[in-house]
């Protein structure tokens, strides 16, 4: 009987820890971007926290023939700079609904900055919804979490 109680305690502990890990998913980490028009993989983006705000940068380019791409359409300090290492999100704040919002979501292909929102998919916490706004128009991409081995 004693072994049965001990086994039950271990099962409860394992279930509790599993639930904690599952529920504690955050937006922070590495994400694979998928072109929502073509369906092709484009890059790995690292989302990180700096000074209490969310930021993101390109850490790997996956798209064929674009590994050393420069931001040729960009202006100012980004003009002709490598896309690899470029910050694409700056100063996003989390609201009370778990959505990160900011005014600096940069698309190096279009060389444009948008207002943006990011949130974890309710159905799959390994998917991140990234939405860029230009006035009342918007476009949403789904990024996939890079699972570390």
Predicted regions and their residues:
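A cross-taxa feature marking solvent-exposed loop/turn segments within ectodomains of secreted
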Residues: 38-40, 111-113, 123, 136-138
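K/E-rich alpha-helical interaction surfaces of small helical-bundle regulatory domains
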Residues: 26-40, 141-147
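Short, hydrophobic/aromatic-rich segments at coil-to-beta transitions
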Residues: 25-30, 96-103, 125-129
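Short, exposed beta-strand-loop hairpins at the edges of beta-sheets
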Residues: 129-139
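Bacterial Sec-dependent N-terminal signal peptides
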Residues: 1-26
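Well-ordered beta-strand positions
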Residues: 48, 93, 119-122, 144
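Central antiparallel beta-sheet cores of small beta-barrel/beta-sandwich binding domains
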Residues: 35, 40-106, 113-114
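Acidic, glycine-rich flexible loop segments
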Residues: 103-125, 130
């Amino acid at each position: 009987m004693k072994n049965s109680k001990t086994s039950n305690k271990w099962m409860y502990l394992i279930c509790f820890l599993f639930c904690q890990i599952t529920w504690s998913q955050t937006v922070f980490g590495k994400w694979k971007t998928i072109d929502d028009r073509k369906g092709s993989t484009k890059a790995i983006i690292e989302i990180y926290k700096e000074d209490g705000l969310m930021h993101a940068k390109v850490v790997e380019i996956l798209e064929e023939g674009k590994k050393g791409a420069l931001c040729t359409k960009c202006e100012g300090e980004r003009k002709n700079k490598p896309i690899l290492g470029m910050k694409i999100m700056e100063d996003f704040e989390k609201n009370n609904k778990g959505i990160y919002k900011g005014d600096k979501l940069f698309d190096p292909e279009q060389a444009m900055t948008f207002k943006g929102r990011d949130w974890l998919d309710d159905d799959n916490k390994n998917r991140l919804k990234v939405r860029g706004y230009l006035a009342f128009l918007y476009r949403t991409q789904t990024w996939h979490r890079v699972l570390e081995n």
